[in-house]
Amino acid sequence: MTRALRRVARCTRAQTGIEFTLVLPLLLFLLLGFIDAGRLIWTINRAEKATQMGVRYAITTDMVAAGLGSYVFTQAGLPQGASIPTTAFVGVTCDSTACTNKGAGPPPGYSATAFANLVQRMRFFYPEIAPANVVVEYDNSGLGYAGDPNSPDVAALVTVRLTGITFQPMTTYAILPPFQLPEFRSALTMEDGTGTVAN
C-alpha cells in the first residue's frame, strides 16, 4: 500500500489531474441538476399549496365578486326556492383589477380588499406571488336556490388559479431564460362567503 502511494506521489505525468479536470465539470453539472430538480419540485409544491389554501380562504371569507354574495335571484324572475340555472348565472372571473361575467348573471361587483386578503394568504405559502398571478372564478355548481334567506343564493364552485409562475434552473442560468410553469388551480364549493378570518 505504501509502495503504491509513493509511486503516485512521484508521478509527474499529471494524468490524474487531467482526468480530474475532465470529469469535474460533468460531476458539478450533475450535482446542480439534482439540486435543480429538488428546487423545481419544491416550487411546484409551494404553488399547489398556495392555491389550496387560497381556495379554502376564498370560500369562507368575503367574496371577491362582492355583488354575487348579496344578489337575490328572485329579482331575475326566478320563483322563490327554484334552483339557479345556468341561464341565470354562468360564472364570474375575477383578477387583480375587476370581476367580469362569463355569460348571463348578476352584476359581479368587485372587492379589492377581499382580493388583496386572498393574495396575502397565498403569500404565506409562496411569497413570490404577485396579484397579477392570481385569478378567482365563481362557477355555477347547481347548488343553492333563489331567495335563500341565509344568502348567498348560489353556492358557486370557487376556483383559485395561479398563472405566470416561472422557474430558473441554476444549470442554465447564464444561457437560458426562466421557463413558464403550468397553471395551478384548486376548487371547492362556496361555504358562507362572508367574514375576514379563516384558518
Stretch-by-stretch model annotation:
Residues 39-48, 63:
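Membrane-proximal amphipathic alpha-helices
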Residues 2-3, 52-199:
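Short, conserved structural patches
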Residues 12, 48-52:
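A broad detector of short, well-ordered amphipathic alpha-helices
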Residues 21-42:
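C-terminal juxtamembrane segment of a hydrophobic transmembrane alpha-helix
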Residues 14, 25, 127-130:
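Proline-centered flexible-loop/turn and helix-kink motifs
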Residues 1-13:
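N-terminal leader/signal peptides at the extreme start of proteins
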